[in-house]
């Protein structure tokens, strides 16, 4: 039996495609309704006010407003959308 594998063959060279997860819109940024805020696996960040959660745990804006990341208790995070007050003139 050969103790070396045949020439020109490799058992490496496979990898899965990256999933492009993470925060998509930063804190303090103005976003429109339907904008994706966070792509994640599981609820690493929880939805707050005016934020929805998709079937794949993606967080998205339900209304136009400003993104606000905040702590939820001691060890959890959440993202909310703050609707700016309309200034009457």
Swiss-Prot record:
One Pfam family matching this protein: Ribosomal_L27
Record-level GO BP terms: translation
GO terms for cellular component: cytosolic large ribosomal subunit
Compositionally skewed regions (Basic and acidic residues) per UniProt: 12-26
Cited PROSITE patterns: RIBOSOMAL_L27 (PS00831)
UniProt KW keywords: Ribonucleoprotein, Ribosomal protein
The UniProt record lists the keyword NADP: no
A GO MF label: structural constituent of ribosome
Residue ranges the record marks as coiled coil: none
Gene3D superfamilies: 2.40.50.100
Region entry Disordered, spans: 1-26
Alphabetical list of PANTHER family matching this protein: LARGE RIBOSOMAL SUBUNIT PROTEIN BL27M (PTHR15893:SF0), RIBOSOMAL PROTEIN L27 (PTHR15893)
Similarity comment text for this entry: Belongs to the bacterial ribosomal protein bL27 family.
Annotated HAMAP family: Ribosomal_bL27
Name assigned to this protein: Large ribosomal subunit protein bL27
Organism: Desulforamulus reducens (strain ATCC BAA-1160 / DSM 100696 / MI-1) (Desulfotomaculum reducens)
């Amino acid at each position: 039996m050969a103790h070396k594998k045949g020439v020109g063959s490799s058992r490496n060279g496979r990898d899965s495609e990256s999933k492009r997860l993470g925060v998509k819109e930063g804190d303090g940024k103005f976003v429109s309704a339907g904008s994706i805020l966070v792509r994640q696996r599981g609820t690493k960040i929880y939805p707050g006010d005016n934020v929805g959660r998709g079937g794949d745990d993606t967080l998205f804006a339900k209304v136009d407003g400003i993104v606000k990341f905040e702590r939820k208790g001691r060890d959890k995070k959440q993202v909310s959308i703050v609707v700016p007050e309309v200034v009457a003139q």
